[in-house]
Amino acid sequence: MARAWGLLLAIGVVLPTWLSSTKVSSLIERISDPKDLKKLLRTRNNVLVLYSESEVAAESHLKLLSTVAQAVKGQGTVCWVDCGDAESRKLCKKMKVDLSPKDKKIELFHYQDGAFHMQYDRAVTLKSIVAFLKDPKGPPLWEEDPGAKDVVHIDSEKDFRRLLKREEKPLLMMFYAPWCSMCKRIMPHFQKAATQVRGHIVLAGMNVYPSEFENIKEEYNVRGYPTICYFEKGRFLFPYENYGSTAEDIVEWLKNPLPPQPQVPETPWADEGGSVYHLTDEDFDQFVKEHSSVLVMFHAPWCGHCKKMKPEFESAAEVLHGDAESSGVLAAVDATVNEALAGRFHISAFPTLKYFKNGEQQAVPALRTKKKFIEWMQNPEAPPPPEPTWEEQQTSVLHLVGDNFRDTLKKKKHTLVMFYAPWCPHCKKVIPHFTATADAFKEDRKIACAAVDCVKDKNQDLCQQEAVKAYPTFHYYHYGKLVEKYESDRTELGFTSFIRTLREGDLKRLEKRREEL
């Protein structure tokens, strides 16, 4: 008996020792009551909740999150729910936390503005979690990309100065901003180049968008993003300005780094000669009156698509203008010089084609090749009306936007949502199957198939909140709460089978209740 009592005392000592070794910040709120969590989500708009299978499973995460909570104090809230605790099991079940798989010991869920935002799926590091809580809708850190492991990631001016002082190897430094589209385009090539030259040359990256880096931006003339600078033995030599380069281009340049060469100014298209007529604000109206059939290309000197189309347009003009029987002519307007014409015809993209018949503007289809230009000018007809968009078609699919998304989903027990982009070929392929599925269940008021066009401006925040990273993405919602990502067959059979399984589950639960009564 004494030995047993001694063993119990020993256990009693061990457990408190373990608990004391896990330094949990007082800033982490431990919650077990559903009402308490509901109240917290209602009063805090940026909450990260750690759900754990047990206290032991939460130990390492609690140590990390204690530091996170201190770093985001006043900006975000960190909570912990121990699903192994009898009092908390009901809460975990209510929040649809599934820790049943043997390898799943914890879940990190993020809630924003009182609603579930996403399952945290980024790197479980102090830097990544803090960055996420400071900007939940922002992109992941560059260093979270496994392919960027050979890029040196700089976080502070102190680290940057230390790198310049200590690094003996040549250094190519990219100063960037996380939101910059040009930066995102070159990053995969930059990191691939870093791997190829590893051990010989250092490639590094630094997000200098925050205001704390104004000194660095001034010192290295960072006027736009990205700005890439080449250093040797800590001394800045010159910038690297080929922002459209591939990994191979970067590696090749690093073999013999040279400063940017002065650019030879391009000859304006109008001064090159050729068969195309070049019109201005002053002579445009008179020209289209004198020619019964005129196709006009509005262009900009810097526009890559214009440069690609220019030789096709010139070749077509040579054929048309050399045919005595042809009444059609091709003309061009530099919209950057002739701003009055550009404004008058609402030119907002380049190249833009306008067609004039006897001085009157008429519709023109999308033309890009010599053959199409010639065919159109030989028989200019009004293009057929564009096919109605998916949203304009009469179907049973609910087309939602950010304003009505939450309210609509809350009214439906089961909703399968397709997040898509109209230009996406995979989306176009699956639309008929998804539409047929919606039609199949249109009589069931508890079931809906909905779609969100992520390209629309008013939907972009919503698609970010729902963690849509590719098109199409399918999510299943139960009374407005995200339950799971649908990853089965993207066919009518796959969709209908999934929804029927949900409906069969409802029937089984109903029968069980009746039996209990």
From Swiss-Prot:
Its EC number is 5.3.4.1. It holds the Pfam family Thioredoxin. GO terms for molecular function: protein disulfide isomerase activity; protein-disulfide reductase activity. One of its GO terms (biological process) is protein folding. It is found in: Endoplasmic reticulum lumen. The keyword Isomerase applies. It catalyses: Catalyzes the rearrangement of -S-S- bonds in proteins. Residues 1-21 form the signal peptide. InterPro entries: PDI (IPR051063), PDI_a_PDIR (IPR046374), PDI_b_PDIR_N (IPR041865), Thioredoxin-like_sf (IPR036249), Thioredoxin_CS (IPR017937), Thioredoxin_domain (IPR013766). Disulfide bonds join 83-92, 180-183, 303-306, 424-427. It comes from the Eukaryota. Belongs to the protein disulfide isomerase family. This is Protein disulfide-isomerase A5.
